[in-house]
Amino acid sequence: MQKAWDYLVYGLWNVWFYFLSIVGILFLFPFLLLFSAYEKWYPQFFWLAHTFWAPFVMYGMGFFPSVRLSEPFEKGKSYVLVANHTSMIDIMLMFWVTKNPGVFVGKKELVKLPIFGYFYKRVCIMVDRQNIKSRKAVYDRAEKRLRQGLGICIFPEGLV
């Protein structure tokens, strides 16, 4: 009985997370559409996600994170942020942690998600984990984005 209850709560938690994520995207839709139109406008896209989307989802889920950095991020510097990925909340936390725009590296399968996939395809560095050429191309695209002054956010052990 406990296992059934756990599955029910987990399922409801996921539904609520995706509901909040989609509502946030729909609310910001015109701005996200505009700022995802050109690569050079990505910092504004990131700012929207950092300032509105991530806090909306985090607070809506009942999370009130406190971030303590051993050293603050220097404004205008590029960083490569690497973390384990065990929950969809990890993405929101990555947006939350830094004000410096970072481009996410992620699996190409997420392009298929309704609404989210449209923006994901336009602003992220996608990788086909089964294709060695795709995995190598990620380095070139990441290097280009770093040269543009953007950071890179990656979850190399993603299990979500």
What is the role of each PLM region?
Residues 1-2, 84:
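Juxtamembrane, membrane-proximal amphipathic segments and lipid-exposed surfaces
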Residues 3-66, 118-122:
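A transmembrane-helix-recognition feature enriched in membrane-embedded lipid enzymes
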Residues 60-160:
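Soluble catalytic domains of membrane acyltransferases
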